Swiss-Prot record:
Keywords: ATP-binding, Cytoplasm, DNA damage, DNA excision, DNA repair, Excision nuclease, Nucleotide-binding, SOS response
Motif (Beta-hairpin): 101-124
Domain description: The beta-hairpin motif is involved in DNA binding.
Localisation per UniProt entry: Cytoplasm
Protein's UniProt name: UvrABC system protein B
GO biological process, alphabetically ordered: nucleotide-excision repair; SOS response
Domain Helicase ATP-binding: from-to ranges: 35-422
GO CC entries: cytoplasm; excinuclease repair complex
Gene name in the database record: uvrB
Highest rank taxon of the organism: Bacteria
Helicase C-terminal domain residues: 439-605
Residues that coordinate or bind ATP: 48-55
UniProt record similarity statement: Belongs to the UvrB family.
Length: 675
């Protein structure tokens, strides 16, 4: 096997880290899809089974073609998983994350039956907002960019032309007055705060202006002026004040995607006034005087804010006026920031395409009520997500990625490439059908067998009630079990899955959450209760996806509890058997022995290994270190540095773990010295 290392391709700006060369069906899939893109095919499908390395195939395609790429996932959990993997494959390139930055979001709404107006209320995640700004910056600056995102990318953000027009380019030796720099920063939605220096803030001390770029995770810019000339530009650490790098030039990007040049705002104010006059005349003619008064009061306040500050609360509702679009035209989105030759990958496309189609309708019905009752101008209807046909019109060359492509992919794909054989030689799980009337007792026996072997089990039920009852039953019988349901938020869901992998518990019960993309190699058994109840949760596609969760384990097995075999079950079992036969044949032909997947449990967003526990850190110290005094001293210095780094980043739990390991090592050194 070739040693891990970086691979480069002609005319490609990407440096691909290959932990291993492509294997199984990967080389054929990479060649076929790359050739399809080069031949100008718009739509292709990668039909890749679970654990066949679809992400690795995508990374190889991106590196070979050398074009910027957008990878769409159906939810934040899978997007985080893809982002972490892409960062491992492209550590030297710009891998960015673009998902909704709301931790909590209550949209503006009106309930006519109760005359209740609900103000927009939201909580924005600062870290994700910084990552979104970093994503658009990378797209505008570099060709070696991979963006991993969700359906959030079809919602309006600022016009790329306006956003680009607002950047502030600073060069050493350029002439610019202090007053002009400050005015430009305010126009870019930076705020002055000389006390609390955080992202999107600038501070001024005499001739020195410190700017904390909105898209920067940790470094700020120090601009030193000599009269009206830029004397120096330095990147520094805002915490310690230490200068990291001197720069000849620096580009400051706007503090928000919704920044707009002053002349555009003034032009928009006039068109908003014109629309307001027309709408008021219409409401008064219809005898809707309360609505007319309400609309005039709200809109005039917004106009005053726009006139004075250049932005207002809810500015996105005026996006049509600000972008100069015609009525009915959609707002600019992340897709508009992509170069014309960019690549698109839609992961788990059978789910994601459905989401892309459904976003527009729900948004429309809520806004129509707001317009009807005078809370918003009719142009607010054009601040909306893209319709599916509008998304299609903006699509770049695209690869649909799924183990179970739906009708849409089958109709649109010009080329279907199968990736059924896994690089590890693992084959699809054996599928068994057992009677449903004894399912719970039978399952309990199977769980005890797996738990004894340190393996994990996923159980999927049809209803919440059944999932709760089953969890209680298993818990009473001494099984370490957790229940995953829709009320659990994204972060907690990721933690539960991580705990399952770490062996904190052995069995995870769920309904519809144990499907697409869940990467849990430790799971050796998937049990599907009431598999013969035909419907969405037991359709052919759902069954294949759920069975696939056991495909990453050497002893993978799926048990379908059913009293009869439905058409969906038959098709799912036949497809699994077809794939299994092909995989076994490939292993036999090439003399491959299947090996299990060993994958580090990492924090998804930061892409780092999960923080070790107190004992784990100490036990992770190599045995030879404990017997060599010099090596032990080096290890103590390393742990001290690690502890300080964690403390500086406010990661106090990890800092405490490093401190405990440090104390344990020092005690060991002391005891050995005494002995």
């Amino acid at each position: 096997m070739t040693a891990p290392g970086f691979v480069e391709f002609p005319d490609s700006p990407f440096h691909l880290y290959q932990p291993y060369p492509p294997a199984g069906d990967q080389p054929g899939a990479i060649d076929a899809l790359t050739e399809g893109v080069s031949d100008g095919l718009m739509f292709q499908t990668l039909l890749g089974v679970t654990g066949s390395g679809k992400t690795y195939t995508m990374a190889n395609m991106i590196a070979r073609l050398g074009r910027p790429a957008l990878v769409l996932a159906p939810n934040k959990t899978l997007a985080a998983q893809l982002y972490a993997e892409m960062r491992e494959f492209f550590p030297r390139n710009a891998v960015e994350y673009f998902v909704s930055y709301y931790d909590y979001y209550q949209p503006e709404a009106y309930v006519p039956t109760r005359d209740l107006f609900i103000e927009k209320d939201s909580s924005i995640n600062e870290h994700i907002e910084q990552m979104r700004l970093s994503a658009t910056k990378s797209l505008l600056e570099r060709r070696d960019t991979v963006i991993v995102g969700t359906v959030s990318c079809i919602y309006g953000i600022g016009n790329p032309g306006d956003y680009h027009a607002m950047v502030l380019i600073l060069r050493t030796g350029d002439r610019i007055s202090r007053r002009e720099v400050l005015a430009r920063l305010v126009a870019m939605q930076y705020t002055r705060n000389d006390a609390d220096f955080t992202r999107g803030v600038f501070r001024v001390r005499g001739e020195t202006i410190d700017i904390f770029p909105a898209e920067s995770p940790e470094l700020a810019l120090r601009l030193t002026l000599f009269d009206d000339e830029i004397e120096s530009l330095e990147l520094f650490d805002p915490l310690t004040g230490r200068v990291r790098q001197k720069l000849p030039r620096f580009t400051v990007y706007p503090g928000s995607h919704y920044v707009t040049p002053r002349e555009t705002v003034l032009r928009a104010i006039e068109t908003i006034k014109e629309e307001l006059r027309e709408r008021l005349a219409q409401l008064i003619a219809d005898g809707k005087l309360v609505e007319a008064q309400r609309l005039e009061q709200r809109t005039r306040f917004d106009l005053e804010m726009l006139q004075e500050l250049g932005f207002c609360k809810g500015i996105e509702n005026y996006s049509r006026h600000l972008s100069g679009a015609a009525p009915g035209e959609p707002p600019p989105t992340l897709i508009d920031y992509l170069p014309a030759d960019a690549l698109m990958f839609i992961d788990e496309s059978h789910v994601t395409i459905g989401q892309l189609g459904g976003m527009y309708r729900g948004d429309r019905s809520r806004k129509e009520t707001l317009v009807q009752y005078g809370f918003r101008l009719p142009s607010a209807l054009d601040n909306r997500p893209l319709r599916l046909e509008e998304f299609e019109a903006r699509m770049r060359q695209c690869v649909f990625v799924s183990a179970t492509p739906a009708a849409y992919e089958q109709e649109h794909a010009d080329n279907v490439v199968e990736q059924v054989v896994r690089p590890t030689g693992l084959v699809d799980p054996i599928v068994e059908v057992r009677p449903a009337h004894t399912q719970v007792d039978d399952l309990l026996g199977e769980i005890h067998k797996r738990a004894a072997l340190q393996e994990r089990v996923l159980v999927t039920t049809l209803t919440k009630r059944m999932a709760e009852d089953l969890t209680d039953f298993l818990s009473e019988h001494g099984v370490r079990v957790r229940y995953l349901h829709s009320d659990i938020d994204t972060v907690e869901r990721v933690e539960i899955i991580r705990d399952l992998r770490l062996g904190v518990f052995d069995v995870l019960v769920g309904i519809n959450l144990l499907r697409e993309g869940l990467d849990i190699p430790e799971v050796s058994l998937v049990a599907i209760l009431d598999a013969d109840k035909e419907g969405f949760l037991r359709s052919e596609r759902s069954l294949i996806q759920t069975i696939g969760r056991a495909a990453r384990n050497l002893n993978g097995r799926a048990i379908l509890y059913a009293d009869r075999i439905t058409d969906s079950m038959r098709r799912a079992i036949d497809e699994t058997e077809r794939r299994r036969a092909k995989q076994i044949q490939h292993n036999t032909d090439h003399g491959i022995t299947a090996r299990g997947v060993s994958k580090a449990v990492r924090e998804l967003i930061d892409g780092v290994v999960a923080p070790a526990g107190h004992d784990a850190l100490e036990s992770a110290v190599p045995a030879e270190v404990l017997t060599d005094e010099k090596a032990m001293a080096r290890e103590i210095r390393r742990l001290e540095k690690l502890m300080m780094d964690h403390a500086r980043n406010l990661e106090f739990e990890q800092a405490a773990a490093a401190r405990d390991a440090l104390n344990a090592l020092k005690s060991r050194l002391l005891l050995d010295g005494v002995g």
